[in-house]
Structure formats: structure tokens, C-alpha cells
Amino acid sequence: MRGGRDVVAPGGRLAPVWDLRRDGFTLIEGLVERRELPAVRAEVERVLAGPLPPGCERPHNTLAPLAWDAPIVERLLASRERRRVLAGALAAQDLRWISGYVSVKDPRSEALEWHQDWWCWDHPVSFSEEPAQVAVLVYLSDTSSRTAALRVKPGTHRGGATDRTVTLAVRAGDAVACDYRLLHGTHPNESDARRDCLILNFAPAWSALPDDIRAHLIRHPALPAHGDDELLPDYEGEPRDLVLNRLAPAT
């Protein structure tokens, strides 16, 4: 495909094109089955009915944090088959869950601006071939350029500059996995309906991460103090906080 904007239609007919390592994102069709969606949506309503911690609302987007013991996280990750699909899509060597969110685009809300989620640009791991963290965005409704579909700039996870934009119009139950370093945003939500998305954040190769990155991530408040699930990260050293830097170096 050449420059400009490519639109992936519902059904993911172009899905084989996108590779997480090469492009910085990939499409996972039907990660959540249609029959599961009503129960998942009901869980989302329960989450949003409660009080949100400070800082959850940002321009044109609300994020409600999810802990490991949240029923909606358990519902999504209890399935061994779903875990297998996730590990395969992420080419994971040692998949571990780090955190989760409900992401809301309100009706008639503006586009979410271009940004990157990576938080430690001063660290050498930022320039690794492999992603240190991946966000899996699970959509609970169909999306389009009118209903806050995700927009991405392929290759920007490796510092490349591009004017090429891909719009990922997906079906309810589909997911998009994004390298934390990828430039991404959304279209506006021009509809009268809310656009809900679940974000599940993973380290695809936990044991291969630098010690100080693991020492920082193990402190994430979404993680339980103790747990023996194979998706939970483990760390035997002293937890520590790294200096955050969310500003990628100029290219």
C-alpha cells in the first residue's frame, strides 16, 4: 500500500498485512465472541457507575482503571483459548498482564490527538526490536471514522517518520494490539452513542525485560500483592520507581 490513509473495513480483510513487530500493531479478529458481549458491556456499566480516581478524564477520553481482580478482567482472561490467541498474536515469549482500563469516547466527542503510550524514553529498551509493552484494545461496538475508530501511523514504534495513517474500522469483539511506542489516536465520535473499549496491557517477554523495567512495572497498582496465576508478573528483586519520560526523541 502506498502513502495516505488506508481504511481497514469491518471484517478485517486487510488484517494479514499488519505485523506487530514490523508495523507496531496487529488486528485480532473476534477475540471476544458476539455471545459474550452483552455480559462484558454490563460489567463495563458497573465499572463506570462507580467513582473514578483523580486523573481518569483527559481531553475527549475517559479511562477507568481495572485491577487484576476486577470481574471484567477475570471474564476476559479466564479462557485458556483466549490466552493462547493473545500469546500467538503478540508472539509472546513470556506473556504477563500489567494493567487494564475501560476507555470511553463519549457521544459527540472530538478526536483523541496523536500520542505514544511509552513512558520511559530515556531507557535503552525503548529502542529494542521487541516491544517492552503492548496494549490490547478490545472494542465493544463496531467502529468507523464516524465512531471513534483507532488511527495509527505504521512504523513509528521504531522512530520512523511517516505521513501514512491507517484507520482501523473494526467489529464489536475485535481487538487491536499496539506497541506502546506506536503513534496512535482516534477519529471523533460523531454519533449519539458512547464508544467503549477495554484496554489490557501486557509485557510479551517479561523475563527478558531489563531488571529495572521489571522492578518498576511490578509496582503497578493494578497488580495484586500476591498471586500465582501464570499471567501475573513475578520479581524477586527490590521494586523501584524509574524516572518517567513520555516524550520520544526527535527523529
Placement of each model-derived feature along the sequence:
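Conserved double-stranded beta-helix
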Residues: 2, 157-251
